């Protein structure tokens, strides 16, 4: 085999297990695939299929109780499956980069964006501060962030979800690695930003000849972006091949079911029913919300004079790209934000005037389904405790009745 024909990544008979405190449980079973330079391969499967575990093993980021039981992971022809963390650190960022699934938990909240992008350069030998600063601005510009000088000075909480994901991509491409592992890179983003992020990854792949391992549960994304598919179920490959072939003529029952369940592969959207005129449950009038911006005089206006009504029994969609003010508006409606001007009433209650116990009791009226489960759920609490908390806060129920409610909800 000539050097030119060596795949950037070649995984052979990979098996991975986790120790649960009593015994090892194998979660990935004899998985094999390869990716050539400039190629996109998608690992597809439902939650728990072993996609992320497989991807994490490539870059040596398995949890402490996980290990590669068998098989090989060759990067540019070198088997790294048995490498120490110290050896792998030399590869991370320079040869293989990871775009994590969740930008909120992946970025350090107390360090500026520019400092975090620059860290990748410093870890790999860059010493000149001016060169680092210049390269950071180049990277932020390359990933499509406006005002890169301002963004470099900002902290992650000052950016929208799409902006934060672009920062992670800037970190991943800083040293032009041979392989990028994109682990559900757009799952928490709106459709408009999702396409832009995927377009950006595709542009970078073409520019640098980078190989891309795309981890996704979305067959629509895989169909649109990947040269080849590997379909996983319970840690086992169900089938793999060129994307068009797998989608046109799936061989496994599981793949056929995934295709049938994929709304992004041609299913006609449901038509919303017409609503009979009803009293509004929510009324927003002239909503304005300004934010202070670090390192900049004046205020940034995120929401500017929005007004709308939501009738009882209806569904009202707020649509816009990342940074358009959707989330700020919703947080104001539920009483989490403090608007600069305007009036919000929910079931006749002026939300902007609520304080203390009145605001706490208002939480029973309006609840959020959050965008990002990783940063919304307390890792120190069990799932049972998290779901039980609203009942403890707002319902005085006997323990037996509360437990029955809990089991019904679960």
Language model feature labels by segment:
Residues 1-265, 272-410:
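ABC transporter nucleotide-binding domains
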């Amino acid at each position: 085999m000539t050097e030119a024909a060596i795949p950037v990544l070649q995984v052979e008979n990979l098996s991975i297990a986790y120790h649960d405190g009593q015994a090892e449980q194998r979660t990935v079973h004899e998985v094999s695939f390869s990716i050539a330079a400039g190629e996109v391969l998608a690992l597809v499967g439902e939650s728990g299929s072993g996609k992320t575990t497989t991807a994490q093993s490539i870059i040596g980021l398995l949890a402490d109780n996980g290990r590669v039981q068998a098989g090989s992971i060759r990067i540019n022809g070198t088997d790294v499956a048995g490498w120490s963390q110290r050896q792998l650190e030399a590869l991370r960022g320079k040869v293989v980069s990871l775009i994590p699934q969740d930008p909120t938990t992946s970025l350090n909240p107390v360090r500026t964006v520019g400092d975090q992008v620059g860290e990748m350069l410093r870890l790999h030998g860059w010493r000149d501060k001016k060169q680092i600063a210049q390269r950071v601005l180049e990277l932020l510009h390359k990933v499509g962030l406006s005002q890169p000088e301002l963004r470099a000075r900002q902290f992650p909480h000052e950016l929208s979800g799409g902006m934060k994901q672009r920062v992670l991509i800037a970190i991943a491409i800083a040293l032009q690695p041979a392989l990028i592992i994109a682990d559900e890179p757009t799952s928490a983003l709106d459709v408009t930003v999702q396409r832009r992020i995927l377009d950006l990854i595709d542009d970078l792949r073409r520019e640098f000849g980078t190989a891309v391992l795309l981890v996704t549960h979305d067959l629509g994304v895989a169909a649109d972006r990947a040269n080849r598919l590997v379909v996983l179920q319970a840690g086992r490959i169900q089938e793999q091949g060129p994307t068009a072939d797998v989608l046109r003529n799936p061989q496994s029952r599981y793949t056929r079911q995934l295709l049938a369940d994929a709304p992004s592969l041609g299913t006609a959207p449901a038509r919303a029913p017409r609503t009979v005129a009803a009293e509004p449950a929510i009324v927003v009038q002239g909503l304005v919300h300004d934010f202070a911006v670090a390192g900049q005089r004046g205020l940034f206006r995120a929401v500017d004079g929005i007004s709308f009504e939501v009738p009882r029994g209806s569904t009202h969609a707020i649509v816009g790209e990342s940074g358009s003010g959707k989330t700020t508006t919703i947080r104001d409606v539920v009483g989490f934000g403090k608007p600069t001007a305007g009036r919000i009433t929910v079931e006749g209650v002026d939300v902007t005037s609520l304080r203390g116990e009145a605001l706490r009791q208002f939480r029973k009226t309006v609840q959020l389904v959050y965008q990002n489960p990783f940063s919304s759920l307390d890792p120190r609490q069990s799932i049972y405790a998290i779901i039980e908390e609203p009942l403890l806060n707002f319902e005085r129920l006997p323990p037996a009745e509360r437990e029955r409610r809990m089991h019904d909800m679960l």
